[in-house]
Amino acid sequence: MSEKRVLRVAITGGAGRIAYSLIPLLLDGRVFGNETLIDLRLVDIPQADMRLQGVLMEIEDCNFSCMEKITTTTDTATGFQNVEVAILLGGTPRKQGMERKELIKLNAEGMAKQAKELEKHANQEVKILVVANPANTNCLAAMQAAPTLPKGNFTCLTRLDEERLRAIIFAEISKKLDKNAANINSSDIKGVTIWGNHSSTQLPTVHAATITIDGKVNKISDLCEASAFESIIEHVQRRGAALIGALGASSAMSAANAIMLHLRSWLADGQDEDAIFSMGIISDNNPYQESLNIPSGLVVSFPCRRVKGGLPGQVEIVDGMEVPEMLHPHLASTIAELKLEAKDLRGSEVVAESKL
């Protein structure tokens, strides 16, 4: 029997709601497999130290099969020491009356500090997933604050939006089909994509998506009414706000599930190299600069896939994906928002200090 490897993983916001849902997924092998043991570091602010201890007790009482070691700390130098994967959940939520520029500045400051600590203490090939909002621009701030870390090692989460899109598409298809007779489920839907910002301007697309029914590959666009696509876009764009309105808090369980899927697609062994998934990555030299006017210098959600024959963590933007002309204004809107956020980032004091 081969010896199990140990993977060092840090989570900021380690005492929070998303971390609480994510930890079991990491420690029972659902992300990196049963042959990988997790040396987990839960990092949070000093005010959350007591809650960290409570989370630690619960982890200990679960006896997870893939748990190697657990560290709880309020010191990033300790939490980030030699880590190979960093999941940045901790951020400042938007408060009533707060302008977007203020939110970007506050979070950019926090992300810059965390990124500098990762640059100083983490493994130099550390893979960084930014979840805290505004996720795309937070990821850009982190990336630029740690210039010695490869840009390709930074991503932000848009998989939650993709899963929301997959769910609503499945619901639409199920209205027309007997899903039990057809023996289908939502995981049979492939190629749905999120473009742009993780915000209400995002562009969900399904025009390259398919579903396999009874062994036959069908285009989603052939199974859904054309009139449904605009409402589907609006559903995904507004889903986060609707959830907050119903729950009184942002998503945690579904966010943790999306993080699991993101990390698995990006970093786990044995993944399908043809599978297309959405993630926010640096837009430098992207194949859509001319056709869709997506510039370099932003963190944008694209359709991505693993590099064929490459190592875990090596991904590429899928070229040739169709975005119908009628959706180009939607795409232009989300790119314009990202440009504005990047401009606000450049204008903040923390960016000037960090030479972002």
Language model: regions and residue ranges:
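Residues forming the Rossmann-fold NAD(P)(H) cofactor-binding site
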Residues: 20
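C-terminal substrate-binding/catalytic lobe of Rossmann-fold NAD(P)-dependent dehydrogenases
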Residues: 146-152, 161-356
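Rossmann-like NAD(P)(H) cofactor-binding subdomain of soluble oxidoreductases
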Residues: 99-168
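Conserved NAD(P)H cofactor-binding loop of Rossmann-fold oxidoreductase domains
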Residues: 90-92
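Conserved N-terminal Rossmann-fold NAD(P) cofactor-binding segment
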Residues: 28-83
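N-terminal Rossmann NAD(P)H-binding glycine-rich loop of SDR-like oxidoreductase domains
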Residues: 11-15, 23
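Redox-cofactor binding/interface segments in oxidoreductases and associated redox assembly factors
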Residues: 87-88, 130
